[in-house]
Amino acid sequence: MIQQESRLKVADNSGARELLTIKVLGGSGRKYANIGDIIVATVKQATPGGVVKKGDVVKAVVVRTKSGARRPDGSYIKFDENAAVIIKDDKSPRGTRIFGPVARELRDSNFMKIVSLAPEVL
C-alpha cells in the first residue's frame, strides 16, 4: 500500500532513482495505491544526464510493493521493496528498460509495454 509521502525506488532507466508520492490518482478520497495503480510523484534523487531531473513532478505506475497483492486464487505476491515506473500521459514508460521483476497484475491494468520490457513477470 502506497500512500501520500511514501518513497519508492524507480525500476527504469529514466534517470530518476527515488520518488516521493504526492497523490494517488483515481477518486477524490483515495488513500492507498497498490500494484498497477497510477500515482503523482516528485523526483527526490536522480542520476546526472537522465531524462527526468530532481524536483520534476511525474506520473508513475506502482510495479512492486512490500504489502503485496491478493490473487484471485487466494495466493499473495509480495516483494522486498516498493518500486514504480515513470510513465507518460499515454501510459507508456519514459525509460527504455525495466529493472527487476514486475507483477502479473500490470497486464490487467493494460500496461503491456512495461510487461513486455520487464525481465521477469511474477
From Swiss-Prot:
Single annotated GO MF: structural constituent of ribosome
Biological-process GO terms, alphabetical: translation
One GO cellular component term: cytosolic large ribosomal subunit
Domain of life: Bacteria
UniProt keyword list: Ribonucleoprotein, Ribosomal protein, RNA-binding, rRNA-binding
Database matches in PROSITE patterns: RIBOSOMAL_L14
A Pfam match: Ribosomal_L14
SMART domains to which the protein is assigned, alphabetical: Ribosomal_L14
Keyword set includes RNA-binding: yes
Entry annotated with the keyword Protein transport: no
Family statement drawn from the similarity comment of this UniProt entry: Belongs to the universal ribosomal protein uL14 family.
HAMAP family: Ribosomal_uL14
Biological role: Binds to 23S rRNA. Forms part of two intersubunit bridges in the 70S ribosome.
Subunit structure, as described in the record: Part of the 50S ribosomal subunit. Forms a cluster with proteins L3 and L19. In the 70S ribosome, L14 and L19 interact and together make contacts with the 16S rRNA in bridges B5 and B8.
Protein name in the entry: Large ribosomal subunit protein uL14
Organism expressing this protein natively: Bacillus cereus (strain ATCC 14579 / DSM 31 / CCUG 7414 / JCM 2152 / NBRC 15305 / NCIMB 9373 / NCTC 2599 / NRRL B-3711)
Lineage of the species this protein comes from: Bacteria, Bacillati, Bacillota, Bacilli, Bacillales
